[in-house]
């Protein structure tokens, strides 16, 4: 119950301490924190098995988010630390692992995914570049990130007028429409469907991108969206190489969302 209350329900320990107190149970939050640490120590063998299973996956989704830890002896309490998530596995046997570090450097994903061979789905953070250079590792980029950037560009267009952001979004939305059509198919059916339907749209999008990039201001909202698309193009289109590859990193973002909710309710970890 303690672990579920903190990490699933997002209830900080000082609030859980108050809940218990209202029911006549006096347990200091320091004791609750110690119990959580002890649980983690007992669960370590299970975590090791989960990591082994994760590293067997053909695709691993990766993401990271900021967290402030006041009582970390290795750093200033005002500095930022990071929570890294790795998610993978089939729907009935999903594996989601979280790792806390005080660094966002590229050696972190190298350590977390040491000896991994397969595809990694990430955002465009440069900290994953070294991992992507490892033998047998292919890097995918998140189409949802690209779409969000064009949505932001669409918001600053003159009202009632269709602009370049709309053109890009129309093509990206078509790609997602194809993914919905192929969702329940086999990997082979998905691969064939992408080759027949998605590749022509990607070719149109790339042609539009090549023509448009030189016509936009790089620091404008639209320019940033266009440059994101251009800088990550090979990683964005790579999902068409196989039917089991994802189009975006939503699996990692969904996995990390409960932690983000908990973080918003806590002053620190």
Report residues per predicted region.
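Catalytic center-proximal scaffold of phosphoryl-transfer enzymes
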Residues: 1-269
